[in-house]
């Protein structure tokens, strides 16, 4: 997947799920499943419900995404 093919959206984590997966509510109201990117795992960045995050979605499956940034 090329970097230009991703769609970046802002959202808020609503629920923790097993295996470092989260339910994220996007700005437009849609709910997606998000998993933590490898760099965030490597640097032990914790994500809790209520955190604002940036999610990358692919045009092929808009129901799942990768959490790439946690805003303060």
Curated annotation (Swiss-Prot):
Residues 1-72 form the S1-like domain. Pfam families: eIF-1a. Signal peptide: none annotated. CDD domains: S1_IF1. Component of the 30S ribosomal translation pre-initiation complex which assembles on the 30S ribosome in the order IF-2 and IF-3, IF-1 and N-formylmethionyl-tRNA(fMet); mRNA recruitment can occur at any time during PIC assembly. Belongs to the IF-1 family. This is Translation initiation factor IF-1 2. It comes from Azoarcus sp. (strain BH72). The gene is infA2.
